[in-house]
Amino acid sequence: MTSPAKFRKDKEIIAEYETQVKEIRAQLVEQLKCLDQQCELRVQLLQDLQDFFRKKAEIEMDYSRNLEKLAERFLAKTRYTKDPQFKKEQNILSPVNCWNLLLAQVKRESRDHATLSDLYLNNIIPRFAQISEDSGRLFKKSKEVGLQLQEDLMKVLNELYTVMKTYHMYNMDSINAESKLKEAEKQEEKQMSRSVRHEEKQTPRSPDSLTNIKIEDKHVRRSSVKKIEKMKEKRQAKYTENKLKAIKARNEYLLALEATNSCVFKYYIHDLSDLIDCCDLGYHASLNRALRTYLSAEFNVETSKHGGLETIENAAENLEANSDKQRLMETYNNVFCPPMRFDFQSHMGDMVGHLCAQQPVQGELIQRCQQLQSRLSTLNIENEEVKKTMEATLQTIQDMVTIEDFDVTDCFHHSNSMESVKSTVSESFMSKPSLAKRRANQQETEQFYFTKLKEFLEGRNLITKLQAKHDLIQKTLGESQKTDYCLASGRRDSTVRKQEAIQIIPLMVESCIRFISRHGLHHEGIFRVSGSQVEVNDIKNAFERGEDPLAGDQNDHDMDSIAGVLKLYFRGLENALFPKEVFHDLMSCVSIESLQERAVHIRKVLLSLPSNILVIMRYLFAFLNHLSQYSDDNMMDPYNLAICFGPTLMSVPEGHDQVSCQAHVNELIKTIIIHHESIFPGPRELEGPVYDRGGAPEEYCDSPHIEPPLVDEPAPDTVSVIHNSDDVKSGPLTVSESDPIEAIARFDYSGRTNRELSFKKGASLLLYSRASDDWWEGRHNGTEGLVPHQYIVVQDMPDGYAGRGSPKADLEGSHDSVEEKVSTRASASSPTGGHVADIYLANLNKLRKRPEATSIRRTIRPVEEGSSGAAGGLKTSSMPAGGLAKDSSDKRPVSAHSVLNSITRHSSLKTKVEGPQVRKSTPTGRSKSFSNHRPLDPEVIAQVEHSSQDIEATMNTALSELRELERQSNVKHAPDVVLDTLEQLKSGGTSEPSSPLHSRLLREAESSQHPLQRSASSASDMPSTFRPSKTTGPKSPLSSMTTASGSTFRDNKPPATRPKPVVFPKSSSAGGSPAMGSPTTTIPPTPPPPPPPTDKSCPV
């Protein structure tokens, strides 16, 4: 029963136990001290919070009082100086409104901070005081409980000490009893071993003696054994008793030890935690409520301040000069309203209150009106340039003053170092070098702006005065139509605005599509390859000026640049062609797999759009579908076109994935291109221009930019429109720029400037327009410039225009019918009217520039039977030149070249050409004005009349050849007269007829009296890509002319453009003065000064 514990003495064990108990007692004392310290820190913290908020309340109150004083100071000043006119709120100017809101915000902040101070003093500070009191009371009670727990723990430790000492005592008694028992057992063993050895030493000699010895020894051994046994039994009983007591003491010690460990664990793990919880009871919750009260107060102050700042922000955003100007003028209406007009004050009974235009002063008024007109043209151009400079300067100033440098967020970045804040502030807007430089630039720009503004206003004042005088004189003279000018402000006249209002297809879109349809369907990579940015900008600027740089058949533009202009137009729209409102509906259509069902759903969505947008979409996608059918050549199938036009026509709204949505957009555009016919309504359902893939030249686009070649009324016997001498003086004579007039030089002339052409006597010149009374715009040997009127004889002029005041003009002017009108552009804009030879020769120039791979055919629609004066039908081969039927009821389009297009390049027509006589195309719609023609010499007239027989012979020969060629032709022609122009070009020569033959052909065409009309521009030279819509397009402004004696040139609308007339000093003699020249003299006249350059940037 040995154990390691027996080797430790009682004193060692008791000393170790006492040391452990001593450490526990010291730890308990430290615990109470720590809790005392925490209580003191808590009380100190609460006291500091009270002092902080007390001081903050004082600061908030002082701040509130200072803000109130600041607001009252300026409010009193505002009330003292307030304008009585602005007492009503609606009359307050926006800057004053900002100032009032700023002062109101200061007063609001003053009240808010006073409320905040009151909350600090009367709400938050008492909360902290109450928390401090509660914490002290709870700590005292918790400390009492802690002391009681420590006393109980020490009692348990003392009980353990007593039980342990009892265990040690009983265990020692047990050990002693055990040692004594072992000693008795050893004695007994010794006794037994001694008896055995004694018996072995004595040998018995006789039985009697042996018996006696045994008895004696037996008696002695028995007495000693009994003693030993008794002693052993006694010690055994003592050992057993002490052993039992030791076991019981050890059990009690183990139980007490376990109980003591449990009490210690419970105290340290649970009791201390509960004790601390008692100390903290309600402390954190109360502190949380106090701080939330503070936060609520601060947040409400911040909310109030933010609301006021939002009000000021809205007022700042509403700072607008125009509204303040309007409000100011309405408030002071009596100051800013225009005064009464100045009325004519008769003097001494003079009751005439209007201009007098009787014969003595009529000439002076006419001359003055022309001078005013010329002066206004110059002033408008100058003032327009000044205005452009002024607007550019104003934009620069606005950029300076609207720079967004008001964000000071960087200055409020919190950092532990103050150096970063200081550096940010030092580099801010108010840095002296940059500020001084900006101020200097701004002042310099402002000075320049005011200089230009003063110049512009002075020029506009002068224009206003001269315009008023001109209008009154023009009204007095009784002219039928007032000449409109482009004012320096860039405003357009009412006629152009009306035309623009009915332009469903924008000019830029219609012209680009027309050009691409004619020349670019086979162009590889169209819309995908970028064009020249310079040329794109030039074409775009020309369109913005109201011109059409793509008019005519000239193919001298880069196709990629024109495609870029078309895409740029749609990309530059403020709102995309497909509105964002239908984006999601259209995207949902893309998910439909069936293309037919998808097209039906797309149609439903697009029908909700305005009709003008639908017309443009229908026009554009019909063109793209047409273009995609040439994908083998141009490599642009519907998908490639969709990739090019998708981002341009439909923008992806913000908040959507641009990449994924763009793929759906492209798929949508591709579907619309393929199924455009089923998606967009037809012309019966939706009126407007319709794109056509091609066809006969009489098919056209019903567009505001191109007048359809319709015969509105029956044409007279001769298509040339004759004016009497008075009409020639006043009515404008225009020429289609694609069909110039030919003239013959009467004298040698050497140009004095680069603008004037030089030529020899007898040279042939092409005339495009009348620049003034004394000058023409023309072309000679490939050079364009000015041609003096006195040096030439106009060959293409009809007899009615042979001279002003000629008897022949008067006679024929009175002879023609006054009830017939011609609506085509050619008849209204060309001085030769329906001269077929002129049409033929002009178109040869155009066709020479065409690619020979294009097969172009022309047909004439069959004339309806039953029309009055019409033949039953048109015969293909033997139709006489003057035998065309006139359809007055159906107003069908007529091909201007239906007869003479069959004339081949005969050897009699092959003559030398002086130079290329095709002028570079200029914008359509810019017709030229001709007026005040100089009279031709009667000798020249006689020479022209003398050659009429030759003209008739030549014309008959040409028509005979036409019939012979038609009989020999193996090609099956249409019911109308058809000519393959390309085959003629391949088989014929490349030269064009000289001027004498040209003149004879024109005279013969007049005698044949054809009612033929020329189509607009070059629409008759190739298959048109446009077809008529159900709606009636706007008529040409030059659609009707009357030939009655004394009739005037009547226009429903003024010409699209008209060159600004130039007035020169009046010559000394009205007749054939040397300065003006005479047709019969052999001495060349002195040419007048050339006119200034015509302003082609301002549409009239």
Curated annotation (Swiss-Prot):
Which keywords are on file for this protein? Cell membrane, Cell projection, Coiled coil, Cytoplasm, Cytoplasmic vesicle, GTPase activation, Membrane, Neurogenesis, Nucleus, Postsynaptic cell membrane, SH3 domain, Synapse
Where is the sequence biased in composition, kind Polar residues? 919-932, 987-997, 1008-1049
**Domain SH3, residue spans:** 738-797
Q: Where is the Rho-GAP domain?
A: 496-680
Q: Which GO terms describe its biological process?
A: actin filament severing; dendritic spine development; filopodium assembly; negative regulation of cell migration; negative regulation of neuron migration; neuron projection morphogenesis; podocyte development; positive regulation of GTPase activity
Site (Arginine finger) residue list: R528
Keyword Disulfide bond carried by entry: no
Q: Where does the record place a coiled coil? A: 170-201, 363-400, 945-972
UniProt biased composition (Pro residues) = 1082-1094
Region (Disordered) location: 181-210, 800-835, 852-938, 986-1100
Q: Where in the cell is it found?
A: Cell membrane; Cell projection, Dendritic spine; Postsynaptic density; Postsynaptic cell membrane
What the protein does?
Postsynaptic RAC1 GTPase activating protein (GAP) that plays a key role in neuronal morphogenesis and migration mainly during development of the cerebral cortex. Regulates excitatory and inhibitory synapse maturation and density in cortical pyramidal neurons. Mechanistically, acts by binding and deforming membranes, thereby regulating actin dynamics to regulate cell migration and differentiation.
Q: What is this protein called?
A: SLIT-ROBO Rho GTPase-activating protein 2
Q: Which organism is it from?
A: Danio rerio (Zebrafish)
